[in-house]
């Protein structure tokens, strides 16, 4: 049996109602054809000229906007008054008659215009009536029951266990048994293969507080029963068949409870319970694994096994008359290839926006009230207008700018480029250059045409008197740093300078800081004392001792007479510090091969054999070798003592002798002639030579570090000085001490 076409009650009234609306429709502003309104003067076309109101809506133009207060960007210049059942800015929205799923056992189609309700139910096999609510006698009466307590389902929090888990004895309801008939097709849905999705909350799809749900959707061919095979951990408690809206909202308000049949290992939904198209079920399962009552949301899409041949698509009811039904031999289902602008599994939805008729990125709104290709509305972006938003709005067409301003139109409105001297959104106000008090710091503003000038207060400058005069720019401080202070300046003088401009230098010498007749020399921030030679110090307060830094050695003394100290060396030393011992042997004072031994402030000569004297200048004649040998072998210090003693005795005797001789000679000289004088002279000469010899002997005895010696005196022949050829000293020989 083919699906029947059910006509909704009152469908035949639709043409009459449409005609009545056309005949009774009022003209603009309440005018009618019998009383035409006098023709208005020709002007620019209004916003209602494009007939933007759809579905019999009445367009009313808004008052012309004030140029000073233009309408908000994007707001149209008209409003639509929609008839009953129609809504939207352009009366483009019509309530979907199929949204409430009026067809209980069939598919709802809004394509027919012969129904006053705006929809047509295509009943499934076994059902009839305007809403497919009447079951044929072949439907088992035990398959449906009334909804006992329709209620809004509430999610179970994930952290909270249900108040009571029904035991299996109470959860399992005694159901009529079912046995498959010969050739009957059954599709099994295994419960353990259905995954629990935690984010699916029954009652609130965005909630995360539910214990989870099971969402299943699959297709089955027509005339096929569905067997829900349960496992050992879950048992089905309740099952409702709901509308599409109730399925989305997890609501049982418009649902009916379903009593499936009991089969081996599961529950069975008979094919008579599954209408052609979408079938939505909500069930509750007592799950012992999750220890909660899990919601099962089941969608079964039933399709006919084969396509119904027809002369045109209008008779192809499987695809709502707006598509081509196709099937494959390997599949038990069919699919619809929809015509242009039709969408949905059964091509049941008309989408006028599918071909994107709106231009300039406008939004297309599908009205869904008729299928003539014009049931859409374009919502234009700011700056565009027209049925398809194809025209750009010229906001400058009414010349809103005044006083010769230039109007610039943009997508969001217009802007006015004002000439000099005017301002405002439409350049309607004249500029007062001094109105904004541009002169700062108590400056006085004067209007100069469209400009202004400022007379600045003392200390300020600039076009708006905003700048302090920089008094320091001219560097008024001669020897200091300039600092601006308010409307003046101040000089911070460098050390050593004073005055208003730091032009005067301090004379530090006025206080006479230098002592001891020193000269004071004035400096910048200071002074310098030039001391006399014998003074030193910052103020020449210290006496400079010439000997303070002089080091005199070896018993020398420092002479501080003068500016520089001088060392006066002890005998035998030389040098600036008397640190050099004079080597008297450098002049080779020892004669006849004598060896010179340097001594402090002197020297000693070690004479060779046969020579004596300080410088080994006296030659000795020895009487015998024994005496010489004894002198040679005698210790030198003993010899020196003996010789010294002999010499002293000899000298005393010699002095006495000489004195006596000289006295005698003087007496004789006084009474004698010249020869006597010459003789006396020769005597003095002899006495002088002899005295030198004795002195040399004494020097050898009493010289520096000389060794003691004793001498025996013997006569020595002095032929030149002795008149009687008799030697005065015959022999000088050493004695052992």
Curated annotation (Swiss-Prot):
Cysteine pairs bridged by disulfides in the record: 48-59, 53-80, 82-91, 98-108, 103-121, 123-132, 319-336, 338-347, 353-364, 358-378, 380-389, 396-407, 401-416, 418-427, 434-445, 439-454, 456-465, 472-482, 477-491, 493-502, 509-520, 514-529, 531-540, 547-558, 552-567, 569-578, 585-596, 590-605, 607-616
Annotated signal sequence range: 1-34
Cytoplasmic side stretches: 662-737
Alphabetical list of InterPro entries matching this protein: DNER_C, EGF-like_Ca-bd_dom, EGF-like_CS, EGF-like_dom, EGF-type_Asp/Asn_hydroxyl_site, EGF_Ca-bd_CS, Growth_fac_rcpt_cys_sf, Notch_Cell-Fate_Det
Membrane topology annotation: Single-pass type I membrane protein
One GO cellular component term: neuronal cell body
Gene3D superfamilies per record: Laminin
Protein name listed in UniProt: Delta and Notch-like epidermal growth factor-related receptor
Primary gene name: DNER
Record keywords, A-Z: Activator, Calcium, Cell membrane, Disulfide bond, EGF-like domain, Glycoprotein, Membrane, Notch signaling pathway, Phosphoprotein, Receptor, Repeat, Signal, Transmembrane, Transmembrane helix
Residue intervals annotated with topology Extracellular: 35-640
Organ and tissue specificity: Expressed in brain, spinal cord and adrenal gland.
Top-rank taxon, per record: Eukaryota
Residue spans crossing the bilayer: 641-661
Role summary: Activator of the NOTCH1 pathway. May mediate neuron-glia interaction during astrocytogenesis.
Interaction with AP1G1 and somatodendritic targeting: annotated span: 677-680
Modified residues (Phosphotyrosine): 711, 721
A Pfam match: hEGF
SMART domains in the record: EGF, EGF_CA
Subunit: Interacts with AP1G1. Interacts with NOTCH1.
Stretch list, region Interaction with NOTCH1: 44-133
Single biological process term from Gene Ontology: Notch signaling pathway
Residues recorded as bearing Phosphoserine in the entry: 685, 722
Main location (coarse class): membrane
GO MF terms held by the record: calcium ion binding; clathrin binding; Notch binding; transmembrane signaling receptor activity
